[in-house]
Design a protein with these regions (language model features):
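N-terminal extracellular/periplasmic Venus flytrap/periplasmic-binding protein-like
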Residues: 10-13, 24-29, 33-34, 42, ...
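Conserved beta-ketoacyl condensing-enzyme motif
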Residues: 22-113, 117-134, 190-204, 297, ...
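Condensing-enzyme catalytic core of the thiolase-fold
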Residues: 179, 266-288, 304-312, 329-343, ...
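N-terminal amphipathic/basic leader segments beginning at the initiator methionine
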Residues: 1-17
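Conserved catalytic cysteine-centered active-site region
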Residues: 57-111, 131, 143-150, 218-259, ...
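Active-site pocket-shaping loop/turn-to-helix segments
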Residues: 14-37, 41, 59-62, 85-99, ...
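Active-site-proximal alpha-helical scaffold in enzymes
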Residues: 87-118, 156-186, 266-273, 360-381, ...
Length: 403
């Protein structure tokens, strides 16, 4: 089978996902096009250099609707003969774009792809596209639907994680992210966002809160207690599904959950012939990809079974992995992953994660693949695994191996 190699990976800084965020003035198409242009410039791509642009995006309405991927191609300097494909696997959309591109290459359907994703959460509100699982009684009732924050608290309750553990993990994420920026660990991958006059709009992640302490987080109110206990009473729904739970321990709040931000990320993937034709050296190969469906109520446990699946399918064990990126959607997701595999925290999200820098839904999967590769190179390690939990009960994973 043909190998699929990563030749480059880059991302924009993440802006606060509010009207006062630095990227709020930039449209989804413009930011996507800016990143595609940067990828082409960095690798010297001209003409019909890639087979397709596969772009992950979750909230595909308004300016993010109508096949954003194709709109981005047309707004960029890429050749108009390059098509575009927008995909949505919720929070793993960016990863699924990369995985789909890699598997297309392995199957012989093209020599190279640009894959990644975007989410402009300040411009297109999360959930504004609707969701049948949340509003259709024919689906909501039999699946025991609860919002993601309740699901995160169910994980904490089921597996015994405390508020103190979650807050400590969040503080460490902030510390690691601040250190990574101070040591320029992201410099290789960051594409600054400029305005039409060439002036810098944003050149670093702006959501971070360096210096956050456990005492600071202890002052925050649990975000999902009211919707669980008062109206509409989702704790009751959870306990109907899991009658062994006497109550739900609400440990999550804004500080130990992922931040709402704007951002985009891209990965250039190609076969060996593509690299030789363009004078590019491969940085890593995509060794394996996987996705899986899980219980939709607890919803966010997907990283565990999908990691088991990808390791089994690739003939590997957890000990074969040097570094891990587990999306910090909520603290309990990462705590459960480390508990399930007895993985040292020293190997997981070593440069911080979404609790510190934010989670631009459609982009995050591609972001963590790029971050993982950069850190493997910095430490001169070989193999990394990236994984995300996914809304409605799914998981996705990618294993990369330096070459």
């Amino acid at each position: 089978m043909t190998e699929a190699y990563i030749y480059d990976a880059a991302r924009t800084p993440r802006g606060k996902g509010r009207p006062d965020g630095s990227l709020h003035e930039v449209t989804s198409v413009a930011l996507s096009a800016r990143l595609l242009n940067a990828m082409a410039e960095r690798s010297g791509l001209k003409g019909h250099a890639v087979e397709d642009v596969i772009w992950g995006n979750v909230t595909q309405v308004k300016e993010q609707g109508g096949c954003l991927a194709r709109s981005a191609v047309l707004a960029s300097n890429l050749d108009e003969s390059i098509p575009g494909l927008s995909i949505n696997r919720f929070c793993a959309s960016g990863m699924e774009a990369v995985n789909l591109a890699a598997n297309q290459i392995k199957g012989g359907a093209g020599d190279a792809y640009l894959a990644g994703g975007i989410e402009m959460m300040s411009r297109v509100g999360m959930g504004s596209d609707g969701a049948a699982i949340a509003v259709d009684p024919g689906l909501t009732f039999p699946t025991y639907f609860v919002p993601q924050g309740i699901s995160a608290d169910i994980i904490a309750t089921e597996y015994g994680f405390t508020r103190e553990q979650a807050d400590a993990l969040a503080v460490e994420s902030q510390r690691r992210a601040a250190q990574a920026w101070a040591e320029n660990r992201f410099a290789k991958s960051i594409v600054p966002v400029l305005d039409q006059n060439g002036l810098t709009i944003l050149d670093r992640d702006e959501y971070m809160r360096p210096g956050t302490t456990v005492d600071d987080l202890a002052k925050l109110k649990a975000s999902f207690a009211d919707m669980g206990q008062v109206m509409p009473g989702f704790d009751k729904v959870a306990m109907l599904k899991y009658p062994h739970l006497a109550e739900i321990n609400h440990i999550h709040h804004a500080g130990n959950s992922s931040g709402i931000v704007d951002g985009a990320a891209a990965v250039l993937i190609g076969n060996e012939a593509f690299g030789k034709a363009h004078g590019l050296r491969p940085r890593a190969r995509i060794r394996a990809t996987a996705k899986i469906g899980t219980d939709p109520t607890i919803m966010l446990t997907g990283p565990v079974p999908v990691t088991e699946k990808i390791l089994r399918d690739s003939g590997m064990s957890i000990g074969d992995i040097d570094l891990f990126e587990v999306n910090e959607a909520f603290a309990s997701v990462v705590l459960r992953f480390m508990q399930a595999f007895d993985v040292s925290p020293d190997l997981v999200n070593v440069n911080g994660g979404a609790m510190a820098m934010g989670h631009p839904l459609g982009a995050t999967g591609a972001i963590i693949i790029g971050t993982l590769l950069d850190e493997l190179e910095r430490r001169d390690l070989t193999t990394g695994l990236a994984t995300l939990c996914i809304a409605s009960g799914m998981g996705a994973a990618t294993i990369i191996e330096r070459v």
